[in-house]
UniProtKB/Swiss-Prot annotation:
One of the primary rRNA binding proteins, it binds directly to 16S rRNA where it helps nucleate assembly of the platform of the 30S subunit by binding and bridging several RNA helices of the 16S rRNA. It comes from Mycoplasma mobile (strain ATCC 43663 / 163K / NCTC 11711) (Mesomycoplasma mobile). GO terms for molecular function: rRNA binding; structural constituent of ribosome. SUPFAM superfamilies: S15/NS1 RNA-binding domain. Gene3D superfamilies: 6.10.250.3130, S15/NS1, RNA-binding (1.10.287.10). This is Small ribosomal subunit protein uS15. Coiled coil: none annotated. Keywords: Ribonucleoprotein, Ribosomal protein, RNA-binding, rRNA-binding. Part of the 30S ribosomal subunit. Forms a bridge to the 50S subunit in the 70S ribosome, contacting the 23S rRNA. The gene is rpsO. The keyword rRNA processing does not apply. InterPro entries: Ribosomal_uS15, Ribosomal_uS15_bac-type, uS15_NS1_RNA-bd_sf. NCBIfam families: S15_bact. CDD domains: Ribosomal_S15p_S13e.
Length: 88
């Protein structure tokens, strides 16, 4: 899980203002940080299948948000991908 201070930091850098947690860019940034922290958890705990279900749900949610952003705001999508280093 992402700590509250880290979430606020991500919202400030990717949101439109410091309280804009609903923008797509901020949501994707928070989900990406959460996914990265869960990757470390699954390296240590390979048999934690119940948490893996939530992990896959987060990945799918981020995937849908990225598809929406790519379809509607491609320039924002491209800059976000580069900043978060998601795709190569």
């Amino acid at each position: 899980m992402v700590s509250n201070t880290k979430k606020l930091e991500l919202i400030k850098s990717f949101g439109k203002n410091e309280k804009d947690s609903g923008s797509i860019e901020a949501q994707i940034a928070i989900l990406t940080e959460d996914i990265e922290s869960l990757k470390l958890h699954f390296e240590k705990n390979k048999k934690d299948l119940h948490s893996r279900r939530g992990f896959i749900a987060k990945i799918n949610h981020r995937k849908k948000l990225l598809a929406y952003l790519r379809k509607n705001k491609f320039t924002s999508y491209a800059s976000l991908i580069e900043k978060l280093n998601i795709r190569k």
